[in-house]
Swiss-Prot record:
Its cofactor is Mg(2+). Belongs to the FPP/GGPP synthase family. NCBIfam families: FPPsyn. Mg(2+) 2 binds at D145, D151. Dimethylallyl diphosphate binds at R156, K245, T246, Q283, K300, K310. It catalyses: isopentenyl diphosphate + dimethylallyl diphosphate = (2E)-geranyl diphosphate + diphosphate; isopentenyl diphosphate + (2E)-geranyl diphosphate = (2E,6E)-farnesyl diphosphate + diphosphate; isopentenyl diphosphate + (2E,6E)-farnesyl diphosphate = (2E,6E,10E)-geranylgeranyl diphosphate + diphosphate. GO terms for biological process: carotenoid biosynthetic process; farnesyl diphosphate biosynthetic process; geranyl diphosphate biosynthetic process; geranylgeranyl diphosphate biosynthetic process. Mg(2+) 1 binds at D145, D151. This is Geranylgeranyl pyrophosphate synthase 9, chloroplastic. The lineage of its organism: Eukaryota, Viridiplantae, Streptophyta, Embryophyta, Tracheophyta. It holds the Pfam family polyprenyl_synt.
Amino acid sequence: MATTVHLSSSSLFSQSRGRRDNSISSVKSLRKRTVLSLSSALTSQDAGHMIQPEGKSNDNNSAFDFKLYMIRKAESVNAALDVSVPLLKPLTIQEAVRYSLLAGGKRVRPLLCIAACELVGGDEATAMSAACAVEMIHTSSLIHDDLPCMDNADLRRGKPTNHKVYGEDMAVLAGDALLALAFEHMTVVSSGLVAPEKMIRAVVELARAIGTTGLVAGQMIDLASERLNPDKVGLEHLEFIHLHKTAALLEAAAVLGVIMGGGTEQEIEKLRKYARCIGLLFQVVDDILDVTKSTEELGKTAGKDVMAGKLTYPRLIGLEGSREVAEKLRREAEEQLLGFDPSKAAPLVALASYIACRHN
């Protein structure tokens, strides 16, 4: 039998006002954390800060300030994410979702989505729902990836992992909820902004990127590859893992941005190749950092891939070989941006350099 709950108009107003006040406070707090964390991360890097677009004079006014661009986009994304998950009942699952979704991070995937949309003539508002959807799915994958049955990680973004705070059962549900919310958010928020045929294509692209031919496939092969003898496994095997586990979602982020921005098929394919390169680049650098940085520097447990016996680039080709591969991938990514307006391509050129030179 259904239970009827009667609320007075004043009670409803009070609850609504409380949620609004909490949301405003949360956005302000999140904005402050974003500026501090991104400023720290970007200031410590040797490259990717000030990028000189092709054909521009070498002065401070024409140089592209990637640090400022990244902070501003992250602030916009964080504000949109905060609004997307209000504190409604049941509170526990909403809190678990918000704990990981609003934990900070570099927001590389939504930034890529927005920058790709802007590259082909779109704007931030048009891309934002897709950018948030990609970040929701990324966060979902991190929550599940950290579980004891997967990577069994204790730290993520400098904080205890979701299951350490809310328990394994709630972490599984939080990840599931984010996966569903991603598609709901993208389709509902974009209604009226994006043509239905474009939205259908975007949904298919995103679903394909995370299913059994995408992220899930990469995670499965990654788990199955633990303790394999690196002498008997080639780079092709490792590339398969990371093209699916890491690059697939980055690829989807870029392609969704171009779709939302009304790009051509040729532009979609160029950005797909660009994202594939930076996806592999991201993982090569991640493998390097895992064996060269401390837990404090990374914000997650250092050396856990080595301890788990996982296949990594340094394990297969050494640190120097891994660095050479990273530089090759960075150059190949930049080559895909030739022919675009240099000023609009500047954020993506800078993003490739940022990923190559990051320290955490």
